[in-house]
């Protein structure tokens, strides 16, 4: 496995359920336990008014406005995500802007190259920005297919011996905007690894979003933010008309960008604020969980004040075992604080999702590690919509049925070599 880093918001989110017992050396099946959403309902927790309070705080913390009037469609796994993205490219009439960290050679990469080339041939302006490190293995033939049709394909921060530090600062954003009207973002890269149902070995589990409405302007800005590094052309007066985007739904959305600068960025601040604001439950799904001391402390403090904190992380099919080991060095303290940690079993878990109190959801490209919060360019959506948050909580519950929950007593008995590896990897966590 190489390194990597159709849907509805509030309709059917049911997936097939694994009936295996799932017992493993350090875990137990989560089947039979109370679901997060059921637990919240059992305690009579009301989400009424929570979103309004959280909106005020997050706006004050980040300074990023919250835009009402959007439609957010959840897309689960490649078998829903790729057809929706390809259809948007196929239907584009004026412009296609694609930004991605991963673009690998294969069937999926070929399908995207074909659709982008077809769009360019019919007169659509196609701008493709690939991270020079994440997409280093892309076949020249695929790039040539797009360029020969008229698409403008560029690479973000190619290696430069004059600026070696720059090589560690990548764009990890995943953005597609078509006709300045419809946008996509989430965790998916353009590669065969994501092409499937997320329940089969080798088919990565991920979550993406199709966005329409005024907040698409924020996604467009996150593309331009990286594009100008390679082109230095912010917009074309003769072409770009920046239309006023009409209301498309009932979701209020905040588009939060993370940049490769020292200190906490807006994404990091937003996550910490949400942890502090949580009253009932926090659900985190992430591919790479290596929290710093501050975030670890905030999660534990939330649990101690009665918040139900649950983490869903990769299991045996993790694509970066060294990052997983660095995160595992944190598990003992979390488990001792009565925070639930579950590991997804069927395939690599690559989604980046957080929900708080059943009313607010965060979906995007950023993981819960130092690289996402300090080294890389990222983009997340904060969605203020109980229907969207509830749908994601149901996805979380369903994924738990395919996961093993770590047992604290068994985790404490893991081998000395295992603990030593964790500590070694933990020492270099600032680069993960």
Describe the residue ranges of each PLM region.
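Charged, low-complexity intrinsically disordered terminal segments
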Residues: 1-432
